[in-house]
Amino acid sequence: QVNFSPGWG
């Protein structure tokens, strides 16, 4: 399961 949370940067 892959969850992309806002804040990758």
UniProtKB/Swiss-Prot annotation:
GO terms for cellular component: extracellular region. It is found in: Secreted. The modification Pyrrolidone carboxylic acid is found at Q1. One of its GO terms (biological process) is neuropeptide signaling pathway. InterPro entries: Adipokinetic_hormone_CS (IPR002047). Hypertrehalosaemic factors are neuropeptides that elevate the level of trehalose in the hemolymph (trehalose is the major carbohydrate in the hemolymph of insects). The keyword Secreted applies. The lineage of its organism: Eukaryota, Metazoa, Ecdysozoa, Arthropoda, Hexapoda. One of its GO terms (molecular function) is hormone activity. This is Hypertrehalosaemic factor. The modification Glycine amide is found at G9.
